Curated annotation (Swiss-Prot):
Domain topic, free-text comment: There are two conserved domains in the glycosyltransferase region: the N-terminal domain (domain A, also called GT1 motif), which is probably involved in manganese coordination and substrate binding and the C-terminal domain (domain B, also called Gal/GalNAc-T motif), which is probably involved in catalytic reaction and UDP-Gal binding. The ricin B-type lectin domain binds to GalNAc and contributes to the glycopeptide specificity.
Name the UniProt record assigns to this protein: Polypeptide N-acetylgalactosaminyltransferase 15
Region spans: Disordered: 134-157
Glycosylated position list: N573
A Pfam family hit: Ricin_B_lectin
Biological classification of the source: Eukaryota, Metazoa, Chordata, Craniata, Vertebrata
All ranges on the Cytoplasmic side of the membrane: 1-12
Length: 638
């Protein structure tokens, strides 16, 4: 039986070998007919080969430059750093992390300061190529960039994402600089720059277009790094895919926070990791014009206390068309809202050259450059400010009042996508109002009362939860900062023309009764008779101003002035011109009497217990005709 089984066993082995070879051949045919898609490494390498190193971006296939800032407690709440020392006090080995964890706090209590910070570097994960192909394109054909793209409506964040996804990541912008700018040759020895881009769920193509625009237009010798700060984005594409993409771009680093910091906190985080001489804070939906960086660095190299910004051109959110802006200055109003103001014809003629730097009261928040050490030594951003609103006002006031200056440079141009007004990602109104209160309490000195008069709800909120600005006021004294009246007199006098500035302000006290002028009406106060009431710091209605125009302004959102009807003092709309203007003129005498200029009579409080209204009477100097304001403003403060 054994001789019969052996041939059967040999045939079985031969059949198995033939079957194995057949399967191998089938597999090879399948691979040849259906090759796998190129890897990310191959795709990016092929893309890079289309561009020269001088004009394009270079790639580095080393380790991913990604840092994750970790805290044990997770959450989407906005939070600045508990226990994190002020930026000015950080040492080089402490500029690592922006979110402190409970474990770190326990370490700090043991006496080692560095233990308050965790710094974790993660290897990047494999990216999602299907999502990548779905949400962005990398066409770089110049002709395709001229294709007419159909505008669509805005997404929830106010951007036309479908149109943006169809637009090439790299496109040539129209030349909008003045011809003299093209004759400028950057000098050698300019400082290096760290460009900090903070984002939260930014559209993928918009973010990458900003990154490549910087890489393509900034000289490599001057660009120290681009630091991307992910402020807890939730989009999947901004996680693993972005990590892999950034890993292959030279001089681009990615920082992630696992707690929502807001724009101010995220910019602070990027600043702590930056190594360039100059910090350039830029929104993550910009495109840079060639030659945008050199003028910024040149002006800062000449004076490290300068805070500078490019001309901000407009990229339409509907069509993504790039439009040049005329020369503007950044200004503000008494509600502490930022305003663009066109440079007038006379102001342009006063410039030494069409490309001369423009002094600006306020720097725009879209793109701003500042020397890194100057930023540190002047306290960086105010840690009390939340999210991202009004930080440009704080930086501008600090620069002007503490020995620096603010400029907009015509030869530096950067386009910015201004989101649709229907965007749902605006800052919380109450948070924005709190930021304004902090700035008013910190920088406006006595002029904060004017701010509160324009926003009564801010006055009410400040009484409920007044911010503790002690540390910032100490910083002002340490830096030897000027007061806000210097800003009004020397930087932006248009905000407060001399004849509108108060000679006296605050509560108007009647010497005879020890009470204050007030309006007791509810609702509409137009025509309200003025009366006496117990003095209170919590009543905005008692905050008055006597101006250089001899008006007595009422402390409310409306511009109302003391007027006279039938011998009684009432509130009426302030008159700017015409004969009726004299009806609202009051002369405040040194002896305390307030004389109505048109009639020559004095303002007097009623002496009856049931009637404390204000009337006009013949001047006789009795105590019911004597008044005083809380504050007197010398001429040099007006």
């Amino acid at each position: 039986m054994l001789p019969r089984k052996r041939p059967r066993s040999g045939r079985s082995r031969l059949q198995f070998l033939l079957l194995f070879l057949t399967l191998g051949c089938v597999l090879m045919m399948v691979i040849l007919l259906h090759p796998p898609p190129p890897t990310l490494h191959q795709a990016v390498t092929a893309q890079a080969s289309k561009h020269s190193p001088d004009t394009g971006y270079r790639l580095d296939f080393g380790d991913s430059q990604e840092w994750v800032l970790e805290a044990e407690t997770e959450g989407d709440e906005y939070s600045l750093l508990d226990g994190l020392p002020s930026f000015i006090s950080l040492q080089e080995d402490q500029l690592l992390v922006a979110v402190a964890s409970p474990r770190a706090r326990r370490s700090q209590s043991q006496g080692r300061r560095q233990g308050s910070y965790q710094f974790i570097k993660h290897r990047s994960r494999r990216w999602d190529e299907e999502a990548l192909e779905k949400d962005w394109r990398t066409e770089e054909d110049g002709e395709e960039s001229e294709e007419v793209l159909t505008p669509l409506g805005p997404d929830s964040d106010g951007l036309n994402k479908p149109l943006s996804a169809r637009l090439p990541l790299r496109r040539v912008l129209p030349e909008v600089r003045h011809p003299l700018c093209l004759q400028q040759h950057p000098t050698s020895g300019l400082p290096t720059a760290s460009v900090i881009l903070c984002f939260h769920d930014e559209a993928w193509p918009t973010l990458l277009r900003t990154v490549h625009s910087i890489l393509d237009t900034a000289p490599r010798a001057l660009l120290q790094e681009i630091i991307l700060v992910d402020d807890l984005s939730q989009q999947e594409l901004l996680k693993s895919a972005l990590s892999e993409y950034v890993a292959r771009l030279e001089a681009v680093k990615l920082l992630r926070s696992n707690r929502r910091l807001g724009t101010i906190g995220a910019r602070m985080l990027g600043a702590t990791r930056a190594t360039g001489d100059v910090l350039v804070f830029m929104d993550a939906h910009c495109e840079c014009h060639p030659g945008w960086l050199e003028p910024l660095l040149s002006r800062i190299a000449d004076d490290r206390s300068r805070v500078v910004s490019p001309v901000i051109d407009v990229i339409d959110w509907k069509t993504l068309q790039y439009s040049a802006s005329k020369l503007h200055r950044g200004t503000l109003d008494w509600k502490l809202d930022f305003r663009w103001k066109p440079l007038g014809e006379q102001e342009q003629k006063a410039l030494p050259s069409p490309i001369s730097p423009v002094r600006s009261p306020v720097v725009p928040r879209e793109v701003v450059a500042v020397d890194r050490h100057y930023f540190q030594n002047t306290g960086a951003y105010d840690p009390l400010l939340s999210l991202g609103d009004s930080e440009n006002l704080e930086m501008s006031f600090k620069a002007w009042l503490c020995g620096g200056s603010v400029e907009i440079l015509p030869c530096s141009r950067v386009g910015h996508i201004y989101r649709s007004q229907d965007a749902s990602s605006r800052p919380d109104p109450e948070v924005a109002l709190k930021n304004k209160i902090i700035i008013a309490e910190t920088w406006l000195s006595s002029f904060k009362e004017t701010f509160y008069r324009h926003i009564p709800e801010a006055f009410t909120l400040s009484k409920v939860a007044k911010p503790d600005c002690t540390e910032r006021l100490k910083l002002q004294r340490r830096l030897g900062c000027r007061t806000f009246h210097w800003f009004l007199a020397n930087v932006y006098p248009e905000l407060y023309p001399s004849d509108h500035r108060p000679r006296f302000s605050g509560k108007l006290h009647n010497t005879g009764f020890g009470l204050c002028a007030d309006c007791q009406a509810d609702g509409d106060i137009l025509g309200c008779p003025m009366t006496l009431a117990p003095c209170s710091n919590n009543r905005q209605q008692q905050n008055l101003e006597h101006t250089g125009r001899k008006e007595i302004l009422f402390g409310g959102p409306q511009r109302l002035c003391f007027d006279v009807r039938g011998g009684r003092v009432i509130l009426q709309n302030c008159t700017e011109e015409g004969p009726a203007i004299h009806q609202q003129h009051w002369d405040f005498q040194e002896d305390g009497m307030i004389i109505h200029v048109l009639s020559g009579k004095c303002m007097e409080a009623g002496v009856q217990p049931s009637n404390k209204d204000l009337y006009l009477r013949q001047c006789d100097g009795k105590t019911s005709q004597l008044w005083r304001f809380d504050q007197i403003h010398p001429v040099d403060e007006r």
